[in-house]
A protein has these predicted regions:
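Low-complexity, acidic Ser/Thr/Pro/Gly-rich terminal tails and inter-domain linkers that flank the onset
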Residues: 1-22
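Short beta-strand and strand-turn-strand segments in soluble, beta-rich domains
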Residues: 11, 60-81
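Short, solvent-exposed loop/turn segments enriched in Ser/Thr/Gly
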Residues: 24-30, 105-108
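Asparagine-centered strand-capping/turn motif at beta-strand->loop junctions
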Residues: 33-37
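Short, hydrophobic/aromatic beta-strand segments
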Residues: 39-58, 107
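Beta-sandwich strand segments
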Residues: 42-43, 116-127
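Short proline/glycine- and polar residue-rich coil/turn motifs
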Residues: 80-91
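Short, surface-exposed loop/turn segments at beta-strand-coil junctions that are enriched for proline
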Residues: 96-104
Length: 137
């Protein structure tokens, strides 16, 4: 496996984000994941195999106004894509997303990323984004 060159790393994550979620829980998200780039996405690896250069999803929670960098997220989680995707291909998958522990208003995002590789942050990428209220259970 190797890093996907930046201009070839384009993807979309589509789904419906509820406006409110319970703090500290995990929520199922039915998603449609699309490879909009010109490079295949290696995603499926055998159990115990290294994940370097595989393509996955990143779910993250930020306080409003905070720069969307993983290190600044109030909470983040890597989510596996269960199969490889060829250019132009889409795949529907439900992922379980951990919800932020502390109640409040958050910017929520699910993006495509490559482990130790492409950031999927160039124009043409379509992450799933929403403002969400996290409430006490």
């Amino acid at each position: 496996l190797s890093p996907i060159p930046g201009p070839q790393a384009r993807g979309a994550v589509e789904g419906i984000v509820p406006p409110a979620m319970l703090a500290g829980t995990s929520v199922p998200f039915p998603l449609r994941i699309r490879n909009l780039g010109s490079a295949p996405w290696p995603s499926a690896v055998p159990p115990g195999a290294p994940s370097a250069q595989t393509v996955c999803l990143l779910a993250a929670w930020w306080a409003p106004g905070v720069r969307h960098e993983r290190a600044l997220a109030a909470m983040s989680a890597d989510l596996s894509i269960l199969r490889d995707l060829s250019p132009g291909e889409s795949y529907e998958q439900t992922v379980w997303v951990p919800v932020a522990e502390t109640p409040g208003i958050y910017d929520f995002e699910i993006v495509v990323e490559q482990v130790d590789g492409a950031r999927f942050d160039q124009p043409g990428n379509q992450p799933l984004r929403a403002r969400v209220t996290v409430v006490s259970p």
